[in-house]
Curated annotation (Swiss-Prot):
The keyword Cell inner membrane does not apply. Heme binds at C461. CDD domains: CYP86A. Keywords: Heme, Iron, Membrane, Metal-binding, Monooxygenase, Oxidoreductase, Transmembrane, Transmembrane helix. It is found in: Membrane. This is Cytochrome P450 704C1. GO terms for molecular function: heme binding; iron ion binding; monooxygenase activity; oxidoreductase activity, acting on paired donors, with incorporation or reduction of molecular oxygen. The gene is CYP704C1. It comes from Pinus taeda (Loblolly pine). Its cofactor is heme. Belongs to the cytochrome P450 family.
Length: 518
């Protein structure tokens, strides 16, 4: 018996020693390859912190620059390290793509558009879009549209000021931005900003359906694969999504058909400047007239989805920051006045003066507004339109900080959290401080891997300059004619979505006309 016990003891000890040696060897080899980022939670933590999700990520990022949240299907890796961001978006770009998960979720709305595809489809569309966004014709056309819609928005605020009414700015910016984008993208006046528009008209129906479809697609991210069951049976949110996408498609296909007919009968020199018209011409040349309406539908809808939210959300948070920092508002006013040809005694809050001031915002005038550019960038630093963005790992890789990611992992960078990291922006990182972008009176941009509000690398946002152009025109007109003060109700918070919308209450402000006596 004693021999058996001794034998068992020796055997167990030997096995334990062998296991220990194997584990030690395994860990040494693992470290050479890179280790997984520390786990800070599971999908349960995401669910518990859903209402403050981006702040939850920020809290974790203050402990670890790179960390993991574990889900049953895969690991979600998050990073705020600019070196990792550069690796993902540029250095090893080919190893990180959109993935089939996101593609499936977005396909019904975005189709095979540029923001929903990888590989050759993406490269082909990127090449064509790059050429178009560099054209002077499109820029001049867009500038005129932005100026006109900024004036319309300012006139609505002027009427509210006369009646001493507060206004909800996020809703106004969303509608104004939709008007601008629809005009630039497919040359149609939606007029969603106008209170006199026909609520039952096709343009109004399209605008509503477009908003609902966006919301329902986001809902798919929240319910996991269950949306596929709902879609199969056409029930719940999927039934709503299908109905609204049909309304969006019906409207867009009619616009495309009408534009084709219009261009077929028009003289070549009378080419319209909107994106749809230009894409029809260029695509028909490249495909010998065989470009499909579905391709055109995907192209213009992708541009709409990307452009609409970016500017509207940024402008909403910009006005919120001005309400909290009145000295910035006054400093901006001084710069805007000194940068334009419209003098103090030549304007009032009447319609014609607002319109003429908007038209005075030339490239030269806007180029002088360094503090305005800095203020908008500072807003985007703290409140990026896309607070979380990520890719899927194609093949196992090791990030520059030494952490390993495996095939199928979701690797995400955190623009919202990055804007609040003291190791990136200093001890005052959480403060709204436009001066951090200014050197000797001149705006100085930051590395896009530190400030990825417009992505970086090969997928850098093609519409970045157009977004700044629209934001600067709208901001200059509004600050020039009005002073903004927040209406003290509930605290302004974000609503956890794909984009950084304010919560349901939006941003209620009181606007006061800036009179000559100011």
């Amino acid at each position: 018996m004693d021999v058996n016990i001794l034998t068992m003891f020796v055997t167990v000890s030997a096995l334990a020693l062998a296991c220990s040696l194997w584990i030690a060897s395994y860990l040494r080899n693992w470290r050479k390859k890179g280790v997984y980022p520390p786990v800070v939670g599971t999908m349960l933590n995401h669910a518990i912190n859903f209402e403050r999700l981006h702040d939850y990520h920020t809290d974790q990022a203050q402990r670890y620059k790179t960390f993991r949240v574990v889900y049953p299907t895969c690991s979600y890796v998050f990073t705020t390290d600019p070196v990792n961001v550069e690796h993902i978006l540029k250095t090893n770009f080919a190893n990180y793509d959109k993935g089939t998960f996101n593609y499936d979720i977005m396909k019904d709305l975005l189709g095979d558009g540029i923001f929903n595809v990888d590989g050759d489809k993406w490269r082909q569309q990127r090449k064509l879009a790059s050429s178009e966004f560099a054209s002077k014709v499109l820029k001049d056309f867009s500038s005129g549209v932005f100026c006109n819609n900024a004036a319309k928005l300012a006139n609505i605020l002027a009427q509210a000021a006369k009646l001493n009414l507060s206004v909800e700015m996020q809703d106004l910016f969303m509608r104004s931005s939709l008007d601008s984008i629809c005009k630039v993208v497919f040359g149609i006046d939606i007029n969603s900003l106008s209170s006199s528009k026909a609520e039952s008209g096709p343009e109004a129906s399209f605008a509503k359906a477009f908003d609902v479809a966006n919301a329902m697609v986001f809902h798919r991210h929240m319910v996991g694969s269950f949306w596929k069951v709902q879609r199969f049976f056409n029930v719940g949110s999927e039934a709503i999504l299908r109905d609204n996408i049909k309304m969006v498609d019906d409207f867009l296909y009619k616009v495309i058909h009408f534009r084709r007919q219009e261009m077929f009968s028009a003289e070549k020199e009378n080419v319209r400047p909107d994106i749809l018209s230009r894409y029809i011409i260029i695509s028909d040349k490249e495909t010998d007239g065989k470009v499909s309406d579905k391709y055109l539908r995907d192209v213009i809808l992708n541009f709409m989805v990307a452009a609409r939210d970016t500017t509207a959300i940024a402008l909403s948070w910009f006005i919120y920051m001005l309400c909290k920092h009145q000295h910035v508002q006054e400093k901006l006013l001084e710069e805007i006045i000194s940068s334009t040809s419209v003098h103090e005694d030549q304007y009032s809050t009447e319609c014609n003066d607002i319109a003429s001031f908007a038209q005075s915002l030339t490239d030269e005038a806007l180029g002088k507004m360094h503090y305005l550019h800095a203020s908008l960038s500072e807003t985007l630093r703290l409140y990026p339109a896309l607070p979380v963005d990520g890719k899927y790992v194609v093949n196992e890789d090791t990030l520059p900080d030494g952490f390993k990611v495996k095939k199928g992992d979701s690797v995400n960078f955190l623009p919202y959290a990055m804007g609040r990291m003291s190791y990136l922006w200093g001890d005052d990182a959480k403060e709204f401080k436009p001066e951090r972008w200014i050197q000797d009176g001149i705006f100085h941009p930051k590395s896009p891997f530190k400030f990825p509000a417009f992505q970086a690398g090969p997928r850098t946002c093609l519409g970045k300059d157009f977004a700044y152009l629209q934001m600067k025109i709208v901001a200059a007109v509004l600050v020039r004619f009005f002073k903004f003060e927040a209406v003290k109700t509930k605290e302004v918070r974000y609503r956890t979505m794909l984009t950084l919308h304010m919560n349901e209450d939006g941003l209620n402000v009181q606007v006061t006309p800036r009179l000559n006596s100011d």
